[in-house]
């Protein structure tokens, strides 16, 4: 009996690897858990071809996502400034603070494209004025946008 067997994962497994990874596991782990539950398949030349094909498709998909992010960054740079209106008290101090949700709404109003608020890094904003906000569009693409906070 071999000490380790090679399998290709069909899904992400936290302690083992990601979908499509070639991993060495104990034969009992493969035989009793991974293979019966469809979480992995034994390594064969046909399976390896499928894995390579899947990886090539994933590389193409990531390249397309990166290009889309670069195009969106250009659109954000073209617009230039985004405005958020907040209620203001004395000395231009805001009631509350400007959140990444507020910035996401301002971007969506201007670009008509949805953006996840969790990808927006907003500094502490408690007064009206002009600020710089970082937007993560892709793992390799970030944009710096100008945000103006005004009273209404």
Curated annotation (Swiss-Prot):
Annotated InterPro entries: Ribosomal_bL9 (IPR000244), Ribosomal_bL9/RNase_H1_N (IPR009027), Ribosomal_bL9_bac/chp (IPR020594), Ribosomal_bL9_C (IPR020069), Ribosomal_bL9_C_sf (IPR036791), Ribosomal_bL9_N (IPR020070), Ribosomal_bL9_N_sf (IPR036935)
PROSITE patterns assigned to the protein according to its UniProt record, in alphabetical order: RIBOSOMAL_L9
Sorted UniProt keywords: Ribonucleoprotein, Ribosomal protein, RNA-binding, rRNA-binding
Cellular compartments per GO CC: ribonucleoprotein complex; ribosome
GO BP of this protein: translation
GO molecular function, one term: structural constituent of ribosome
Function text: Binds to the 23S rRNA.
Family: Belongs to the bacterial ribosomal protein bL9 family.
Protein name as it appears in the record: Large ribosomal subunit protein bL9
Lineage: Bacteria, Bacillati, Cyanobacteriota, Cyanophyceae, Synechococcales
